[in-house]
């Protein structure tokens, strides 16, 4: 035990006890020795869904040898919440269709590069329509630039009037800096050449290149709001001390949206992990650790905000896995459809979540959307998934 910090030692011991069950044949029965957090009224409830976008293998994260890559989840978040180690992704293992299944509760089969919207209603549309909510109540902040149409389906009774506000921070920054460096020097862009070079270095860290087409929904941000968000992003980017990976930009924008609007429904897509396609295992693990840190910092931001503290449920889930070394192409890909591509996990923490608990009950990523519906008090009867009883 750490005699200088006994509380930290006990937290580590608790985390090891809980996570060790992921390697055993048993798990804590639901609610056994678990104390649920207080549950706010539905109208006061807030839900944040965060994806380990790009896909991560179970063995590199929640398996015992993977804990070193998710130290904050393992030591800081899991002991406060509930973990499902036996989650499964069903359906296609591309990014758009995988995350599409998360936000609709139904398997999707549309263009993998984001030129088509989901074919079934999203949580954003159903939430806003049933409660007659303004667009400021539902947001999607995504590192993946192909997610421009993820905020809503094209169904006649839903679609753009009820879809989420979608912000792609990397793309917003690209367009902002391109506009800035094409004008005369001014505040924030004194050295246009240096700014452009820094943009190229920072924004080319991810797997997708500048040539990828970005598809935009007809539900667009107002010019004033877009300009205001772009100014904040540019100010952040201009600070030499600011980290500038795609996920760092997404994290900054998520906090900005939370501070300005305090939306009831927020989905955050981190995606630096997909750098694994380059075949560098060290970069893949570095991105996992970055995502783990950003999830923890986001949860700390929730706890520091009076509008979110004690009324927010955070759900953290990989959008899918990645190939195994034996049956697939290894960590670098996610197209084999083998079990390593499909086995994932889910961690929940916050309002209404049992503390320090877990269940070996198999669940599906399709269950995330109807669980969000139950938490926020709207109907989602037509999807394939089912609400997670432990959380609702």
Across the structure, where does each feature detected by a protein language model lie?
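Active-site-proximal N-terminal segment of extracellular/periplasmic enzymes that hydrolyze or transfer
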Residues: 26-80
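Short, structured active-site-proximal loop/turn typified by the sulfatase FGly-forming signature C/S-X-P-X-R
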Residues: 60-95, 137-139, 359
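N-terminal export leaders
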Residues: 10-28, 32
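Non-catalytic, well-ordered alpha-helical segments in soluble enzyme domains
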Residues: 124-129, 361-389
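N-terminal secretory signal peptides
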Residues: 1-10
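Active-site His/acidic residue clusters
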Residues: 58, 64, 152-154, 227-238, ...
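Metal-dependent active-site segment of extracytoplasmic phospho-/sulfohydrolases and closely related
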Residues: 47-49, 283, 290-332, 372
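Substrate-binding rim/cap in mid-to-C-terminal beta-strand-loop elements of soluble/periplasmic
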Residues: 97-104, 333-376
């Amino acid at each position: 035990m750490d005699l200088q910090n006994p509380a930290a030692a006990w937290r580590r011991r608790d985390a090891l006890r809980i996570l060790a069950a992921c390697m055993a044949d048993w798990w804590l029965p639901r609610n056994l020795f678990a104390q649920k957090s207080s549950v706010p009224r539905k109208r006061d409830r807030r839900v944040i869904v965060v994806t380990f976008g790009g896909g991560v293998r179970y063995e590199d994260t929640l398996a015992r040898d993977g804990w070193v890559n998710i130290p904050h989840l393992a030591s800081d978040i899991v002991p406060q919440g509930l973990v499902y180690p036996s989650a499964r992704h069903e359906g296609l293992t591309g990014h758009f269709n995988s995350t599409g299944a998360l936000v609709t509760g139904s398997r999707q089969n549309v263009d993998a590069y984001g030129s088509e919207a989901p074919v079934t209603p999203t949580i954003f549309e159903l939430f806003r329509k049933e409660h007659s909510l303004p667009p400021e109540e539902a947001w999607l902040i995504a590192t993946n630039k192909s997610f421009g149409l993820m905020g809503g389906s094209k169904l006649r009774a839903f679609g753009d009037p009820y879809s989420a506000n979608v912000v792609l921070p990397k793309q917003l920054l690209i367009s902002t800096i391109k506009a800035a460096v094409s004008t005369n020097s001014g505040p924030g862009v004194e050295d246009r050449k240096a700014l452009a070079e820094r943009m190229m270095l920072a924004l080319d860290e991810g797997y997708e290149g500048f040539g990828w087409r970005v598809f935009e929904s007809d539900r667009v941000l107002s010019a004033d709001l877009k300009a205001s968000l772009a100014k904040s992003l540019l100010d952040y980017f201009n600070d030499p001390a600011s980290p500038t990976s795609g996920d760092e930009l997404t994290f900054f924008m998520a906090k900005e949206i939370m501070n300005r609007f305090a939306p009831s429904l927020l989905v955050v897509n981190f995606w630096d992990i997909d750098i694994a396609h380059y075949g560098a295992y060290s970069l893949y693990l570095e991105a996992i650790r970055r995502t783990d840190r950003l999830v923890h910092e986001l949860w700390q931001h929730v706890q520091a905000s009076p509008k979110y503290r004690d009324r927010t449920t955070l759900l953290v889930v990989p959008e899918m896995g990645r190939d195994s070394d034996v049956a697939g192409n290894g960590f670098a890909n996610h197209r084999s459809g083998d079990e390593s591509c499909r086995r994932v996990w889910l961690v929940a923490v916050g309002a209404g979540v049992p503390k320090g608990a877990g269940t070996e009950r198999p669940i599906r990523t399709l269950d995330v959307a109807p669980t969000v519906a139950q938490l926020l008090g709207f109907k989602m009867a037509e999807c394939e998934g089912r609400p997670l009883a432990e959380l609702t």
